[in-house]
A protein has these predicted regions:
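Conserved nucleotide-sensing/catalytic segment adjacent to the nucleotide-binding pocket
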Residues: 1-21
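Acidic, Mg2+-coordinating active-site environments of NTP-dependent enzymes
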Residues: 11-13, 17, 35-181, 204
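Short, ordered loop/turn segments at secondary-structure junctions
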Residues: 22, 43, 96, 214, ...
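Conserved helix/coil segment N-terminal to the catalytic DExD/H
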Residues: 23-31
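Glycine/threonine-rich flexible loop motifs
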Residues: 27, 49-55, 218-221
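Active-site beta-alpha connecting loops in nucleotide-dependent enzymes
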Residues: 166, 190, 197-246
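Conserved phosphate/oxyanion-binding catalytic-loop motifs
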Residues: 184
Length: 246
């Protein structure tokens, strides 16, 4: 990691957006790094093969903010109140349901995009992102918040969001048939429920969910994900997903 960051500096790269895993925090893989902004999106049952309990998992996540100047916290997550008591850095919250600093109004979610309004620097902005799902609104809110704090111009932020494509996230695959095929990385209970809930609102026919869980990893989440798919999909296919040594 340090070598990679050094190469970036040598090539005049000014900013890095990096996912910092709970494993990396717990094992001090990012020890010595200082972050301008630390972001907490959510916490759900995952990696309990490593952390053992959700409290341990949260404690690992909280370490990020001891290395950050500022925190952006999803105020709608059930662990947000506890996390906010654990951190001492300046922070702001984002969300849709609770009393937060960054929120969206007039939210429209359809089968191909989301659109909403939000105030940024006292200006009402209309945001559109071509990734369907309510979770996209959350991701967009925190992206706008972080970019604005780094003095990125709002016009540039809106243009970037309007054109963003994330391979493997609500990605529609054209198979030349009358049905829709969508690929999503959903690999834990919360993300699987989010994508299936979004699809269920717009599907005109049956929903067939094909998913698996990685081998030699958290086994606790497997039946939970099975229940979610069984509840939200019309038919579920369980398949292998990198079985490793299982």
């Amino acid at each position: 990691l340090q070598k990679l960051l050094k190469d970036m500096v040598d090539n005049d790269i000014k900013y890095v957006v990096m996912e910092v895993s709970s494993h990396a925090l717990e094992l001090d893989r990012v020890y010595g790094l200082h972050f301008i902004i630390g972001i907490f999106t959510n916490l759900s049952e995952e990696h309990l093969d490593f952390h053992k309990t959700m409290d341990n998992y949260l404690n690992a996540k909280a370490k990020l903010f001891a290395q950050s100047d500022y925190a952006l916290i999803n105020g709608d997550d059930i662990y947000a109140p506890k996390l906010l008591k654990m951190i001492s850095v300046k922070h702001a919250t984002f969300g849709l349901d609770n009393d937060v600093n960054l929120t969206a109004t007039d939210v429209r979610v359809n089968a191909s995009y989301v659109e909403f309004k939000m105030y940024v620097n006292k200006m009402l902005e209309t945001v559109r992102v071509n990734i369907p799902g309510r979770f996209t609104v959350y991701n967009s809110l925190v992206a706008i918040g972080a970019a604005s704090m780094l003095n990125v111009q709002m016009d540039a932020i809106l243009l970037a969001l309007a054109n963003v494509k994330v391979p493997g996230r609500s990605e529609v695959i054209d198979v030349g048939k009358t049905f829709t095929v969508m690929v999503d990385y959903a690999h834990n209970p919360s993300s699987l429920e989010a994508i299936l809930s979004s699809v269920k609102k717009h599907a005109k026919g049956r929903i067939i969910c094909v998913f698996g869980c990685g081998g030699d990893r958290d086994k606790i989440k497997r039946p939970i994900m099975g229940e979610i798919s069984g509840r939200l999909a019309d038919f579920t296919v369980i398949t292998t997903d990198n079985p490793r040594n299982e």
